[in-house]
Regions:
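N-terminal catalytic or cofactor-binding beta/alpha core of small enzyme domains
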Residues: 1-102, 107-183
Length: 183
């Protein structure tokens, strides 16, 4: 899977109700293939904040995975979020983090037809790009979830993103990650 060829996982309430498990299985297969080709992640960096509904995707995933996979180093939870304001401090406090096989998880903004879509990609995440922030690229691979439409008043859009969608996407990502990382 090249950096230019992300695995798109369409996601909606309808898919959860009718085909959710097969969609989770598809994501698990994709993640396991990625792990076989490029190595299992040694750490998980979940970017975002619980102070913004749309930006809470990362910390929700981090909190869930920290419980499900206690052996995996997880940074970025609801209790200890990693966001634009503290990212450089976190990187300074964990200097070996960038040397590990790192999986980054973050929310993103995109086109209307992509809302609810998860992207699984090889290569670094560029956090903050949806809100025009210049932050260092992170991760050997990443998962982003398009939580709302971007392009105009991004901070307002993130604040007014449906919590139900963000929580369902976080649950989906957590299920797929836990299944893909458990033997």
């Amino acid at each position: 899977m090249a950096d230019t060829e992300p695995m798109k996982v369409p996601f909606s309430d309808h898919r959860i109700a009718t085909k959710g498990q097969s969609t989770v299985d598809e994501a698990v297969r994709t993640l396991r293939s990625l792990w076989r080709q490029h190595g299992v992640p040694e750490a998980l960096l979940c970017i975002g904040t619980d102070r913004s509904t749309g930006d809470a995707l990362g910390p929700l995933v981090g909190t869930e995975i920290e419980t499900q996979l206690p052996r995996l180093k997880v940074l970025g939870t609801l209790n200890h979020p990693v966001h634009a304001g503290n990212l450089e401090d976190v990187l300074r406090n964990y200097p070996d983090l960038t040397q590990k096989r790192l999986l980054a998880v973050d929310a993103s903004l995109g086109r209307l037809q992509d809302v609810g879509t998860l992207l699984i990609r090889l290569g670094p995440l560029r956090p903050g790009s949806g809100v025009n922030k210049q932050l260092p690229p992170l991760g050997h691979y990443h998962i982003t979830g398009t939580v709302n439409v971007g392009g105009f008043m991004e901070y307002f859009v993130l604040q007014n993103t449906r919590l139900a969608l963000v929580m369902q996407m976080a649950s989906f990502i957590s299920l797929a990650l836990a299944a893909s990382l458990n033997p």
